[in-house]
């Protein structure tokens, strides 16, 4: 079920940690999950800069990311009213994307510099650009916490998550005159920059069981986090502004806070074998520090709305489905080629097969449809020419979990 914030199960280590105190059996509850994800990020860039002949032309850029295995682990030990829980997962970041034909921001920078330095005598039809760019960001999280059942209907949780961020960029751009014009190199850009940092997230939670209702909430405090560059290569043409170079300079530290996060959920038992839930998430992005105070350009934090239903067809088989709507407070100043977001809705479907009293298997599929985001500027990437970028994404995830309790 997509909306897991009020569920009482081993995955509550992340989604509803206070609810772990209401697990029906004492002992160990363990879950090992593997996810397989496929994502694309696409940019349609339209500007007269590409031809400089008075016509607006479009270039298409596509980044792909494929992760055949994304592992995670949830574990809890319950004894009487107490539960100690732990988990490991990739809790954030955009994964890795490879743009085989580069990014428009670097193409535009090269085209603008060539036009400026040649005083317009060298036009795009006279040279070729060979470029590629890879970007990655992963947030690895290790969580530990304690849940306590105060009475028959109320429980609480306190804990924390240690986050380690690993990100970076690697790519190149070489612009050369065509052989018919002599083959001279006009621009050479080389970049290899790794980034890392860590931070601690305090977490609290509460769960209330009221008859057929289960109400739950979780709050993750803002994580103060700086990432530091380890730059092995930073070669750029003369004339590139300092503001472009600074984010990739060796030793440079960049704010990259993880925003505070609130989850509120309600689950209802319609029938003994039929349950439904609704859930709301808020990410306080506007108060999470970013490079150049980029967060201040957002119009609001991120809102997510979720709903789900699950049905025990027979004792040994449960099926589920759900919906998620994600709304970002995006602005043109916030969106960049190396980090852009799109509001979306998602559909998820899953099933659990109970192999025995101790063993069960979960299987799930999650599909996301993104809204295009259009960004227009009269000074496209600082070139003095107009231009428009249309950002879009796709995402498909398949998951499989093996659960064991004893």
Question: For each of these PLM feature ranges, what is it?
Answer:
Residues 1-93, 340, 366:
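N-terminal, post-signal peptide beta-strand-biased segments of exported outer-membrane/organellar beta-barrel
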Residues 3-8, 25, 70-406:
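Outer-membrane beta-barrel porins/channels
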């Amino acid at each position: 079920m997509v909306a897991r914030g009020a569920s009482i199960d081993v995955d509550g280590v992340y989604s509803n940690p206070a609810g772990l105190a209401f697990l029906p059996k004492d002992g160990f509850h363990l879950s090992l999950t593997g996810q397989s994800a496929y994502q694309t990020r696409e940019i349609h860039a339209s500007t007269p800069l590409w031809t400089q002949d008075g016509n607006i032309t479009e270039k298409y850029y596509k980044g792909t990311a494929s992760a055949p295995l994304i592992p995670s682990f949830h574990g809890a030990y319950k004894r009487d009213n107490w539960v100690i829980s732990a988990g490991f997962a990739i809790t954030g970041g955009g994964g890795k994307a490879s743009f085989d034909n580069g990014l428009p921001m670097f193409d535009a920078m090269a085209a603008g510099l060539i036009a400026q330095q040649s005083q317009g005598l060298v036009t795009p039809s006279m040279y070729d650009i060979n470029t590629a760019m890879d970007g990655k960001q992963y947030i690895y999280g290790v969580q530990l916490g304690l849940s306590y059942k105060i009475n028959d209907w109320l429980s609480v949780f306190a804990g924390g998550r240690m986050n380690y961020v690993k990100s970076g960029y690697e790519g190149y751009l070489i612009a050369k005159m065509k052989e018919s014009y002599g083959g001279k190199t006009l621009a050479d850009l080389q970049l290899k920059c790794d980034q890392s940092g860590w931070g601690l997230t305090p977490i609290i939670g509460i769960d209330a069981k009221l008859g057929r209702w289960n109400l739950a909430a979780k709050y993750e405090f803002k994580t103060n986090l700086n990432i530091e560059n380890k730059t092995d290569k930073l070669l750029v043409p003369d004339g590139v502004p300092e503001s472009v170079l600074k984010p990739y300079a060796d030793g440079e530290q960049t704010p990259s806070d993880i925003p505070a996060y609130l989850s509120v959920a309600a689950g209802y038992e319609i029938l003994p074998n039929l349950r439904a839930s609704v859930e709301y998430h808020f990410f306080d992005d506007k108060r999470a520090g970013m490079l150049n105070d980029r967060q201040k350009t957002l119009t609001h934090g991120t809102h997510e709305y979720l709903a789900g239903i699950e049905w025990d067809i027979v004792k040994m088989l449960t099926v589920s489905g759900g919906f998620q709507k994600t709304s970002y407070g995006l602005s043109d100043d916030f969106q960049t080629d190396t980090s852009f977001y799109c509001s979306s809705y998602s559909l998820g479907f899953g099933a659990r097969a109970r192999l025995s009293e101790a063993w069960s298997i979960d299987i799930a599929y999650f599909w996301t449809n993104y809204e295009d985001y259009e960004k227009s500027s009269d000074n496209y990437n600082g070139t003095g020419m107009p231009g428009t970028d249309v950002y879009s994404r796709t995402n498909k995830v398949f998951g499989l979990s093996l659960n064991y309790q004893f």
